[in-house]
Regions:
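Auxiliary Fe-S-binding modules of radical SAM enzymes
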Residues: 77-158
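Conserved AdoMet/S-adenosylmethionine-binding subsite of the radical SAM
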Residues: 1-110
Length: 158
């Protein structure tokens, strides 16, 4: 039988000016695990140092190709842990009808030691681990934002 493939990416390498550069990979991809760090473009840039436009263009491209996608989102205390932020994420991904899953990942501090050992400054220094008890509420907020936005899009079309 055929080998199934899954691409785990934030999509930042995608070049929206030349989507054909990704044909070789995407033509063989069955599913994408797409990491979205923040729903707000300005906050995304502050958090990651990267403009999210390429990531969103990658999301649009895999939606156009009807490749299944699982959205992965790390919930960081004080940054992405509000109902409002999670609703924004839902609204952001709503146009993508290829979304088959949503993984809300609670931020943890297990990687801090690696950064210290390598002498690399850790951007989230002092941020506590995420309270996992809040995860269902925040996941529901993403789903609610997605549902609201899809209803708006449907009504706009007619």
């Amino acid at each position: 039988g055929r080998v199934h493939t899954c691409l785990d990416s934030c999509g930042y390498a995608f070049d929206p000016q030349h989507p054909e550069k990704f044909d070789a990979v995407l033509n063989e991809t069955d599913m994408v695990l797409l990491d979205i760090k923040h729903a707000d473009p300005v906050e995304h840039k502050k958090l990651t140092g990267c403009d999210p436009a390429r990531i969103l263009a990658f999301g649009d491209e895999i939606a156009r190709r009807k490749i299944k996608v699982v959205i992965r989102h790390v919930v960081v205390p004080g940054i992405t842990d509000t109902v409002e932020e999670c609703e924004k994420l839902g609204r952001l991904i709503a146009p993508w009808h290829n979304v088959v899953g949503l993984e809300m990942l609670p931020y943890h501090t297990m990687g801090v030691v690696k950064y210290e050992q390598l002498g690399i400054p850790y951007k989230l220094e002092g941020v506590p681990q995420m309270d996992t008890a809040r995860m269902p509420e925040l996941r529901n907020a993403v789903m609610a934002g997605m549902k609201k936005r899809r209803a708006e899009l449907k009504n706009a079309i007619g």
